[in-house]
Amino acid sequence: MHLSAPHFWWKNKSFLRFLLAPISWGYAYFSRRRMARHPPIVDLPVLCIGNFTCGGAGKTPVVIAFAKVAKELGFVPGVVSRGYGGRVKGIHLVNEEHDNAYDVGDEALLLARHAFVAISVDRYAAAQRLKKEGCNLILMDDGFQSRRLYMDYALLVVDAMRGFGNGAVFPAGPLRVPLKTQFSLMDSVLLIGDSDACDYIAFLVNRTGKSLHHAHLESLASDKVAGKSFLAFAGIGNPDKFLKSIKELSGHVVQTYFYPDHYFFTNTDLKNLVQRAKMHNLWLATTAKDYIRIQTSKMQEDLKNLVVFDINVNFVQKNFCRVLLQEVMIRFRERKHSL
């Protein structure tokens, strides 16, 4: 079962935050101890692309961007993923043609279009499997807080619209581990988008002496959007970014239906959405991640008026991925020489 992030996580003052504080303190204690562990080391350079909080921050397009640049530089990148939302057990090498979102999760299928992807709870074992496949660079999708694989560099992604939420640790807030602990172990922050919270986020990062980088998301669509009216539906961590994508392409959002993150739409769900759209003469709109999950449905042929929205990440710093990958390789060589 997949749950949506509670609204009070994104509010500074909340009775529920106060009520859940004792549980949060206990969770924070054990999460700090977990992050103090010495993770197993794989004989490959490892770049972790994670985030500070539970829920979506925009990691997936960032991982894809690094995979593309890595291939341009001559690497054979492999992505280590938890395969969240999937049901396969053990270590599984994702096959885009034969696997589906039910088995491996939507994010793993999206990533498999651009690189080898191995999913497993045991990230070290997944990295070893990718090494056997000929990969010479590991991109770790999430996993910063799990400490299941040594990383040469940790880049944490922050959604500017949400920031660090109310600043509390789960379940009182969205943080996976106290900020102080995470800041001490990460290497740099990638802030995606703009908001009133950007200055505060920049202040916190600069105070640690770590580097801060900026990026923006570019909206892409499978069909013409301008002037069309939409019934938008999605099961993602932050649907506000999806609605913003429609508006950026001059579309009009008339109705919205949001579901829990990684939600698998039933045929009844899709049938109802199609009927509501027809009733009000609306186009349907959803995200690329949601469409991955819809493709296993028998209702796919009835979604003729569906526009799929995807996102591309644009980095403010020129050659950002190239420069950071070079830093990863420098650290990897230093690690090997120190052994």
Swiss-Prot record:
MF terms in GO: ATP binding; tetraacyldisaccharide 4'-kinase activity
UniProtKB keywords: ATP-binding, Kinase, Lipid A biosynthesis, Lipid biosynthesis, Lipid metabolism, Nucleotide-binding, Transferase
Enzyme class: transferase
Signal peptide start and end residues: none
GO biological process, one term: lipopolysaccharide core region biosynthetic process
Listed EC numbers: 2.7.1.130
Residues the entry annotates as binding ATP: 53-60
Disulfide-bond pairs as recorded: none
InterPro entries for the chain: LpxK (IPR003758), P-loop_NTPase (IPR027417)
Record Pfam families: LpxK
Pathway, per record: Glycolipid biosynthesis; lipid IV(A) biosynthesis; lipid IV(A) from (3R)-3-hydroxytetradecanoyl-[acyl-carrier-protein] and UDP-N-acetyl-alpha-D-glucosamine: step 6/6
Reactions that this protein is recorded to catalyse: a lipid A disaccharide + ATP = a lipid IVA + ADP + H(+)
GO cellular component: plasma membrane
Keyword Lipid metabolism found: yes
Role: Transfers the gamma-phosphate of ATP to the 4'-position of a tetraacyldisaccharide 1-phosphate intermediate (termed DS-1-P) to form tetraacyldisaccharide 1,4'-bis-phosphate (lipid IVA).
Matches recorded under PANTHER family: TETRAACYLDISACCHARIDE 4'-KINASE (PTHR42724), TETRAACYLDISACCHARIDE 4'-KINASE, MITOCHONDRIAL-RELATED (PTHR42724:SF1)
Sequence similarity: Belongs to the LpxK family.
Record protein name field: Tetraacyldisaccharide 4'-kinase
Species in which this protein is naturally found: Bartonella henselae (strain ATCC 49882 / DSM 28221 / CCUG 30454 / Houston 1)
Encoding gene, per UniProt annotation: lpxK
